[in-house]
């Protein structure tokens, strides 16, 4: 069932690199060979949307198709008490009506260059973990800065195969991105949380943005023509997107820690946040508007994490992983030249042990740098931490900074820091109060740092003091403090800045433990990867890294509980499901879908499933046919696909997509968006 690297010749699994496509598998099973021109066209038509979504150019005038739930953050930020675009939808009838998103960026991969030799040359085996981490950071920062200065393209060095190879990805960035179209949430997310990660589905989970350059719609040479017929059953299709993260190459001991420690901690936090936001949103429609996007994200993460934990708790799954690892270790034992690689497993165990010692405090005080530590769930705190750390990091040599403050990451960081998106005091206080309560409960009320953080007050009182007292809601103040650096912060009286300064030394120490342990793991996983290359060749794919990948498969239904699940659903099925639930939430249709149902061809295919391998991050990915035409839009996977974080199984695991036929039919018949239909189908020049 599971292998460290998926290499079965006739399976549809794989998150393949564009510079190492599954040519043999495609030729052997589907008699299709992608040309270099075909691959380049798909690559340069694909778009990374924001920090965790996918999309594609679908017209020569910069029109980008992605999911409603990927666009929901922008929809919420553009909304106000009188215009709820997330709930009610939006359509710009003219270019002048397209709304500029406050902090959304699009990235399009232009080139890939192998830099493994240069990275490895900078990290000799004699270095300890701390030295190796610093040396690797320095050389990666140098490579990224040189590339960006030479090409003008945003440049990222990507670690693949756990450190087996390093590749330089260069992107064209668009930061002037405008909203063009979004349907109502009730049809984009029809069925709500009960239907999430389920199939059959009936969702118009689409959103259209437009990239601009110099104040005008961007002209792009590579875009996907939309095939209004959509796919047929058993068609070969491809998915080009940005899968976020998988753990298919983890050792058994690392998976054990994930099962027993990491996922339970994350789930406790997610359940807590879900209850908090759901209760807040239930008080009023305005409350619901303010937290709608965040609540969706939390529920989505909770359901996905539940599925991942269920997979790891399966004795059959774990037995298969143990068997697979033991078989590979035996191969290494029988190869004298590769036998030393066996020690890599011990080094991974040691590194995991070090990280598990500080797991809880690390998540609470540091966490993912984008989230600012789970103990401080506040956008204002994240802004304060960015300002405090920028004052320390920016004066350092580029290669010695924390990764997010390198020159290559400056533009994305500043886009978020100076976002004019609204910040709501009541939401800030709610989330910060609850996360401070969680922090105190987990670390203990007598912990010296906890006492300093709360400053003798209850979590609610402290959160109110911090949120009401800070000046960081003012973007002008952020600019002044960021540009002024340490001199501007010194003596500056702001409670949120003071809190970020207080917590920073402890958070940095914890981050260093994780980074040095990860460095040890990286070297060990790299050795394992190179050993697998030696035994299996390079027809294997790496774990997902949030970078562009190509998946393939066929449009196909499956069997569940002895019943056939068809590959397609239709508009007729949508109305039947709403009727079965008496049009009650979350199976209630927007008024226009009731009033105008007679305009639709109810036999139009709505959603479909494919065996193509996708995971979180693939949302918004185009589904393309052999001709390179867009025939669908990935928006979910079924419940069986949640095991895909650890292994792929084509028997029941399916990715779920909106059919291109449904997109065209809905735009035309429900929304009277004929100009958009013409732009999508015929690539007609803008005339709006």
Name each region found by the language model.
Residues 3-688:
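Terminal presequence/propeptide segments associated with secretion/organelle targeting
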